[in-house]
Amino acid sequence: FFYKKNLEEKYLKNWKDLQPKTVQLLNYFNQNVGQYPYKQYSVIQGGDGGMEYAMATLITGKRKFGSLFGVTAHEMAHTWFQFLLATNESLHPWMDEGFTSYISNKAENEILKEGKVNPHEGSYRGYRTIVERGYEESLATHSDRYDTNWAYGTASYSKGNLFLSQL
């Protein structure tokens, strides 16, 4: 873990609390997806939002714990659903982001003991809304060819997630 030690106390606490939860995340993914093949995984405060790399996550520092955990879970899951599975995130963003959303939602629900009957409920809501408003686009659309960011986000994160949840 690498984060600024001069963060406000509330954010510093969140980063400290994240450390044992990150171990739980790695164990969850190892048990439910496959073994992590590298010797270490790093969570680093930096960047804008969250960004995945094969052995690291960069994430902004000033976050509430739930947000910090959720982004860490999602970005860490990309180790399997992009890097190890070798999906082409430009050609098939729904596999990259959707599969990652699926497993990170399940991990978050279990590790944080959220008790949700359906941890993918937000994806169902988002998908339903875009369909009702007539903005849905095909999953076969290349990531930089969507008409709107909304259509890209819903297809990639929500619709890809729902694909797995329906299996």
Each predicted region: which residue ranges?
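Juxtacatalytic substrate-recognition/specificity segment
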Residues: 1-93, 103, 107, 146-150
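Acidic/His/Gly-enriched intrinsically disordered linker/tail segments
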Residues: 91, 97-165
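Generic hydrophobic alpha-helical segments
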Residues: 68, 164-167
